[in-house]
């Protein structure tokens, strides 16, 4: 590749094939683009906690501010112990990442994938698996998530695994559809292969999903979780994984040493110890989800999917608009939702709406009604 300057700087061939990951626009970007005030904008596009962080986390970060000139902890022993207690596993089964669960995905790639090997993802699902692992010269193999039934097509996963497969990703609740994967199906995948099966439980609290009971009998199980959702720390970028101690030890060999900042460490530790906050956040988000679901079901123009996460997938083709068109109309009214056109396995007629405060939910339903009815 030749840069604009004419320099023959060598770029890896694989990087030329990767389309940049495009996250949702920020509140400031939307405000500037549409002439809106930032405090008027309702963000329902990124599956965040509408209640904000735990007060204990805020206090912990404030106390830690005077120490940010010091390097952070590397072993993270106290945080790993707290996560182990929360998840019901041993501390040697825990790894913590400093760019949310996305760092853990990258570490999985660096630990298990050789160039040319493959990983399996049922689509549609979280796009970052593929985005991250392609950079390791790995090959994505798509299995099928049955969108109409909102369930995993188990046979497609079993058929997709071959001798080149090193990782299988199963997201439950699935993002963006909100559907669950039955534990018997997870067990079937685990017992059909020696490949590492990564079960993404980023939204575990909203669904009561917990597959940690499968860990003792399946050393090829790895569970992926995050502090970005019910824990209310999306801006602090903290994720963690649970797995066999030997797998965790190998992953620690390639994980960045100081990736978790002092502030993130303090916030995560305070939050996971604040069980009242976690319970309150879980209950509120579920209440908001059910309020949104019942409100959306009243629109005959929409096909609304039952969700077990903190978001709802909606087929909007009955409105006569594409997802991009409806999302744009909502943006002009100060409401951000996720246009799901970029998700492999979905066409141009799907949006995903995150739970907000009940007042934000009411405003969204009101504006949506004005636009489509």
UniProtKB/Swiss-Prot annotation:
Entry-annotated residues carrying N6-(pyridoxal phosphate)lysine: 229
Keyword Amino-acid biosynthesis: yes
Cofactors named for this entry: pyridoxal 5'-phosphate
Superkingdom assignment: Archaea
Catalyses which reaction(s): L-histidinol phosphate + 2-oxoglutarate = 3-(imidazol-4-yl)-2-oxopropyl phosphate + L-glutamate
Pfam families: Aminotran_1_2 (PF00155)
Keywords (A to Z) from UniProt: Amino-acid biosynthesis, Aminotransferase, Histidine biosynthesis, Pyridoxal phosphate, Transferase
Pathway assigned to this chain's UniProt record: Amino-acid biosynthesis; L-histidine biosynthesis; L-histidine from 5-phospho-alpha-D-ribose 1-diphosphate: step 7/9
This enzyme's EC code(s): 2.6.1.9
GO molecular function terms attached to this record: histidinol-phosphate transaminase activity; pyridoxal phosphate binding
GO annotation terms (biological process): L-histidine biosynthetic process
Family membership noted in the UniProt record: Belongs to the class-II pyridoxal-phosphate-dependent aminotransferase family. Histidinol-phosphate aminotransferase subfamily.
UniProt-recorded name of the protein: Histidinol-phosphate aminotransferase
């Amino acid at each position: 590749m030749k840069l604009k300057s004419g320099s023959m700087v060598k770029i890896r061939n694989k990087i030329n094939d990767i389309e940049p990951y495009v996250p949702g626009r920020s509140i400031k970007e939307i405000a500037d683009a549409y002439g809106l005030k930032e405090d008027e904008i309702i963000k329902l596009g990124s599956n965040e906690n509408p209640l904000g962080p735990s007060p204990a986390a805020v206090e912990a970060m404030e106390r830690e501010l005077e120490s940010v000139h010091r390097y952070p902890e590397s072993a993270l022993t106290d945080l790993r112990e707290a996560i182990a207690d929360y998840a019901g596993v041993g501390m040697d089964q825990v790894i913590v990442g400093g760019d949310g669960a996305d760092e853990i995905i990258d570490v999985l790639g660096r630990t298990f994938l050789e160039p040319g090997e493959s990983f399996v993802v049922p689509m549609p699902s979280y796009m970052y698996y593929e985005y991250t692992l392609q950079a390791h010269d790995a090959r994505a193999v798509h299995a099928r998530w049955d969108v109409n039934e909102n369930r995993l097509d188990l046979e497609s996963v079993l058929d997709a695994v071959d001798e080149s497969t090193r990782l299988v990703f199963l997201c439950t609740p699935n993002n963006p559809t909100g559907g669950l994967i039955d534990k018997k199906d997870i067990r079937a995948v685990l017992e059909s292969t020696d490949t590492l099966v990564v079960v993404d439980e980023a939204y575990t609290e909203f669904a009561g999903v917990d597959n940690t009971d499968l860990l003792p009998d399946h050393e090829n199980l790895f569970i992926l979780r995050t502090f970005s959702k019910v824990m209310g720390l999306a801006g602090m970028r903290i994720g963690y994984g649970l797995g066999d101690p030997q797998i965790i030890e190998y992953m620690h060999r390639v994980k960045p040493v100081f990736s978790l900042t002092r502030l993130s460490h303090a916030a995560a530790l305070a939050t996971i110890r604040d069980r009242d906050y976690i319970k309150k956040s879980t209950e509120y988000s579920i209440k908001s989800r059910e309020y949104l679901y019942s409100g959306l079901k009243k629109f005959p123009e929409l096909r609304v999917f039952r969700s077990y996460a903190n978001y709802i997938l909606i087929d909007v083709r009955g409105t006569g608009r594409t997802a991009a068109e409806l999302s744009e109309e909502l943006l002009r009214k100060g409401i951000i939702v996720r246009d799901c056109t970029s998700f492999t396995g979905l066409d141009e007629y799907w949006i995903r709406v995150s739970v907000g405060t009940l007042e934000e939910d009411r405003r969204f339903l009101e504006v949506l009604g004005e636009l489509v009815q």
